[in-house]
A protein has these predicted regions:
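Feature captures the FAD/FMN-dependent oxidoreductase FAD-binding
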Residues: 1-16
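Short alpha-helical interface elements
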Residues: 2-5, 32-37, 96
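Structured secondary-structure scaffolds
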Residues: 2-3, 48-49, 55-179
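Short, polar/flexible loop-turn hinges at active-site or ligand-entry regions and domain interfaces
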Residues: 14-19, 78-82
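Cys/His-rich short segments
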Residues: 16-68, 72
Length: 179
C-alpha cells in the first residue's frame, strides 16, 4: 500500500493525473467501464457484462496519451523489449494505429470502498491495474531487495494482459522516473 501511495503521489506531483467526468456505461458484474466498441453488432452489450447502466462520475485519469510516441520509439529502439516478435508487432500495431486513451485510475470511495485511497484525494481509491502493476516494486522494496530483484531481466506474462504490461506499465515507470 505504501509503495502504491508513493508512486501515485509522485505522478500526481508531476502533473501526470487530472480529474474529469466519466460519462459512459458500467458493468457492475465485471466491475468495468464499457465503450461503444464493447457492443455487439446489434448494438446490445454482451450478456457476459450483466446489467449495464449509464454512469456519470468524476475520476482521476493518468495521461497515457502524452507518452505514446515515447513508447513507440522505445520499443523500436529496443526490439527485445517485447518478445516474441509477433507480440512486439501486436503492441506496435496497436500504438501506431490507435490513439492511446488516458487511463482511469480511480473510483469514488462512496461506490468502491475496498481500494487503496489516493494520497492526494482520499475521497477516491485506486484498484486493480494501477496497484497490481505497482506490486512489482512493492515486494522487492518491502524485503529490502530492490536492487537485486528490480528491474527484472525477463518478465513472462500471459497474452491476455499484454497491453497492461507492454503499454501501461512502461509508461507508468517512465512517468514516475523509475526503471
Amino acid at each position: 500500500v505504501a509503495v502504491v501511495a508513493e508512486v501515485l503521489q509522485q505522478l500526481y506531483d508531476k502533473g501526470e493525473f487530472y480529474q474529469d467526468e466519466y460519462v459512459g456505461f458500467y458493468s457492475a458484474k465485471q466491475e468495468t467501464f464499457l465503450t461503444e466498441k464493447d457492443r455487439n453488432e446489434d448494438g446490445v452489450f454482451d450478456p457476459i457484462y450483466g446489467e449495464v447502466q449509464e454512469l456519470r462520475e468524476k475520476n482521476y485519469y493518468f495521461k497515457l496519451g502524452q507518452h505514446q510516441q515515447w513508447l513507440i520509439d522505445y520499443i523500436d529502439a529496443n526490439p527485445d523489449f517485447v518478445a516474441p516478435d509477433y507480440r512486439r508487432n501486436e503492441v506496435l500495431g496497436f500504438l501506431k494505429n490507435e490513439t492511446l486513451e488516458d487511463l482511469c485510475i480511480s473510483r469514488p470511495k462512496e461506490r468502491l470502498e475496498w481500494g487503496i485511497p489516493l494520497p492526494f484525494d482520499t475521497d477516491y481509491v485506486t484498484y486493480v491495474w494501477f496497484d497490481a502493476l505497482t506490486n512489482y516494486l512493492s515486494i522487492p522494496r518491502s524485503r529490502g531487495e530492490e536492487a537485486e530483484l528490480w528491474p527484472a531481466d525477463i518478465h513472462v506474462i500471459g497474452k491476455d494482459i499484454l497491453k497492461f504490461h507492454a503499454v501501461y506499465w512502461p509508461i507508468m515507470l517512465k512517468a514516475a522516473d523509475l526503471e
